[in-house]
């Protein structure tokens, strides 16, 4: 079984999602192996623009099974919204989308803890002015 890999070796925004969308009909499996909901792949399907953050770009293609792998970070709130936004297209997610049991989750508590941690840094770190004195 041959495998082709599409990697972005810059800072993102290389158009990987669009390339996958163009090539998806040639593949049985489209896998997203890393990244999180901060990524965004803008695709056009049936004349409508869609921005996918977690769901792989091959989801609109009938042949491809889409896989969310171990290294992907899933925000359940964003993921649920993506699924709901795609409901009008009658995509059978039970057959077309597989999610690794080892994929990571971003929960609301993580966001709260992250915000609290950042807020503490604002008050405990010396300012550049203090360092230069």
What are these regions (language model features)?
Residues 123-133:
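Single conserved hydrophobic/aromatic residue that forms the stacking wall/gate
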